[in-house]
């Protein structure tokens, strides 16, 4: 951004809590026009779960939206127990709560909240297995340690291009083209 604007920008990365640490630091900083926050969808999820957290619709003014993406549920391309969403739901329902899906580890994240709504709407009981990092999450999916994967397509692009995963459900307002 510095190269585009000609303005020196000091980056102050605050890891932890899926952005909640950074949000807390940002909200404590002076509202003087010199502080800018880069944030992901977890700001909305955090507020939805705890209304004392900053409300992105009221407390933040968006300057730029850099990416709008969708989430998908993936299975291994060579999976034989189920091949599409209807057969996956039927299979999960028959497992009596023993089916698993790899997901992010942060309770209250957008991914986990959406997966909760999906399972309720589909009358499924599925264990969300938490992984802090993508590589172990994708490895567990490829290796068959979990039955499915909840992710965004950009994060698993190389696996999609290689034919390792295939989406069986897309969560988006319109069908991706």
Predicted features along the sequence, with ranges:
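Sec/Tat-exported extracytoplasmic proteins
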Residues: 1-5, 13, 30, 38, ...
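Hinge/capping helix and adjacent helix->loop/strand transition within the periplasmic-binding protein
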Residues: 3, 25-34, 47-136, 173
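Early extracytoplasmic/lumenal segment of secretory-pathway proteins
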Residues: 6-24
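Short helices/loops that flank or line small-molecule/ion binding pockets
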Residues: 20-32, 116-117, 121, 135-149, ...
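Short, Asp-centered acidic motifs that coordinate Mg2+ and/or phosphate
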Residues: 33-37, 72, 147-148, 167
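Beta->alpha turn/N-cap motifs
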Residues: 38-43, 133-134, 150-156, 171-173
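C-terminal lobe and pocket-closing loops
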Residues: 68, 83-84, 155-177
């Amino acid at each position: 951004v510095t190269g585009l604007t000609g303005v020196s920008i000091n980056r102050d990365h605050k890891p932890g809590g899926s952005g909640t640490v950074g949000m807390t630091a940002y909200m404590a900083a002076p509202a003087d026009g010199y502080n800018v926050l880069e944030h992901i969808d977890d700001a909305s999820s955090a507020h939805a779960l705890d209304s004392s957290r900053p409300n992105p619709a009221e407390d933040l003014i968006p300057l730029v939206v850099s990416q709008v993406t969708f989430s998908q549920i993936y299975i291994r391309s060579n999976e034989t127990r189920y091949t599409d969403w209807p057969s996956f739901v039927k299979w999960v329902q028959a497992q009596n709560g023993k089916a698993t899906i790899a997901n992010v580890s942060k309770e209250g994240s957008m991914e986990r909240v959406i997966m909760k709504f999906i399972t309720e709407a589909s009358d499924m009981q599925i264990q969300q297995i938490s992984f802090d990092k993508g590589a172990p999450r994708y490895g567990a999916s490829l290796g068959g340690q979990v039955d499915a994967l909840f992710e965004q397509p950009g994060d698993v692009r190389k696996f999609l291009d290689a034919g390792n995963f295939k989406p069986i459900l897309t969560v988006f307002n319109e069908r991706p083209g």
